[in-house]
Amino acid sequence: MHRLLDILASGVHDAKNQLFAAESMIATAEKAHGVDLGEARYAIEAAAGRLSRTLTTYRLLRHGASLAVVPTVVADLCEEVLLAQAKQLERAGVRLGLACSVLDEWPLDRDLVGDILNNAVQNAGRHARSRVELSAVLEGGDLVLRVEDDGPGFADPSTAAAGGTGLLVGERLAALHVRRGRSGALLLCNGGRLGGAVFELRLP
Amino acid sequence: MSAYANKRFLVIDDLPLARESLRAIAQSVGAFAVEFASNYQDALYRIRNNTPDVILCDYMLGDGRSGQQLLEELRRFGLLSDDTIFMMVTGEQAYEQVVAAVELVPDDYIIKPFSPDKLLLRLDRISAKKKFFAGYYREKRRQDYAAALAVLARNKEDEAGRPYRFEILRQEAEAHLASGNAGAAEAAYRSILTDYEFPWARAGVARSLHRQNRHVEARAEIEQVVAGTPSYFDAADLKASICMAQGEHAEAQRVLDEVARKTPRNFLRKRLLAEAATLNGDAETARAALADVIANDSMPGAVSPADQLALARSQVAAGDSIAAEKVLLGLRESEVKGFDLALQASYVALLALTSPERGAPRLAGLRPALLDTELPTDTRIDVLRAALAGADAELAERQARSLMAGPEAKKVFALLRKAYTLHGRDADLREIQRQVALERIHHEPTAGAGPAAA
């Protein structure tokens, strides 16, 4: 079983190196010719992200999956999601806002949580009319990361998680974050501050 | 103009395509001078000769080496200045598992592919963090730990320190440990653990307990870490050291054997393996490990006279006096003259064991000093063996007593017994053992008074 994971990981690793080469060539061309090829770079990063997520899904859904928890500055994490997604949403006429009121470090799997947030923002961007907001707050000792949009909302929030791989991974990822005997949770609902879908990741 | 225009970048990667990509990205954030290193040795050479400002190092360097090992070696030899940024670049998740566990971490790590913007953001944050800790680093480098801890105490109160609260606690624990205050270090690591079960903090507790000679507790803590994070090899090293202190040399060797096989070019670990094998009576493994260290640890200055002496020691233990003598005589006389007393004593004791006519007179010359100086454990054992071989019961007894009464008694007992048995003097050792035990009982009331009164 481990062997299969190793083979998959090494394939993904090679593909990501190739994609990174492509991205760096584009960055060089942008600099040399003073052009913005952000869309092409975004497409490359999205492809790499998709590859990683597939591997992550496989890894997390097996038994005995473990996280790589590091102290993470929450504001920095949110800022990176903004950096990765804001321009792409803008092209679709959607504004991505950020509201982070958490100043401290939080123990979490920085890369997987970042990946899940990127995925949630992409999804929200597809359904939003004009706005998506990413926020981070502390509630009852939990870190709450929310992605809200002003779209029509989930058809049925209670079954939404079963539909998408991203949400399935989100649920598993939240549950694996355990601290002081409590574990995290993924909550989906409609309404929120923007009136559309609400994606909420709670981490203890 | 970019803030990184005047910075010197070093890109370390064994794959040409990946190297080229990293350079292109570095140049697109404004870096003007970007150097390459294609392998481990090349990287060490460049960093030694002209430390870059920013190092972008791939985690997988090929040839059994990793970026993590390079980072550890750079820190071990003090080759990274406080201002140098070391960023690990990784294509897969394996490194995240490592960085989440270990005590020694890079300034940051980044997953490929990444945009120039993301790199820039990360570099800016590292610079801000380095600026925040600058005062602490300064005192730490001067080894003024009281001042360093005072800076951290101020940092803790500072609003700007909120994003770094775990880092401040971690540095606090390390500063306590470095200053020799293992009790305070233990408390600092435990306070981190009340917040989150980080493997490196649990290992820190084990290390602090080990330093306080509380080996049973240390062992329980480190077993927990090793079981939970098998890829955390330093934890395995620490477990082995604790096992040795408890006299469980076979287990220590088993643990080290296993991790050394996964990290064939980690020569600090090989040295530790040799120590465990020597204590375990497996002279052949010790000899092979040390020969590997001396032949292949290519870091300049890494192979020390202590390594040569350790090799000779293992050869003596393996019964190969000729090879041991060759190693000893390979050390230049001028070099031996420059040794401190402990190394000189080991040298002449080992020489006396392999070539009595050369070594015995020199051992006799050092004898008065050896009778009443504090010596490290290795040296005491060398002297003890040579004294037994030369029928100098008094010199042998002096060493045996100190060892038996010291904190490493459990560690060395099997070796002592073997040495005494070899010369048919088991009764002497039993008598020394009895006397040390009596003395301990005699001193117990005073030793126990502290806790009882508190």
Per-segment meaning from a language model:
Chain A
Residues 38-92:
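Conserved DHp (HisKA) dimerization/phosphotransfer helix of two-component histidine kinases, i.e.
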Residues 3-7, 19-49:
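Histidine phosphotransfer helical core of two-component systems
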Residues 123-125:
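Short helix-loop "hinge" at the ATP-lid/N-box region of the Bergerat-fold HATPase_c
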Residues 131-141:
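Short beta-strand/loop element within the Bergerat-fold HATPase_c
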Residues 116, 120:
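Hydrophobic residues in the alpha-helical elements that line and stabilize the ATP-binding pocket
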Residues 176-192:
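Glycine-rich ATP-binding loops of the HATPase_c
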Residues 146-168:
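Glycine-rich/acidic phosphate-handling loop/turn and adjacent ATP-lid/helix
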Residues 95-104:
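Conserved catalytic submotifs in the C-terminal HATPase_c
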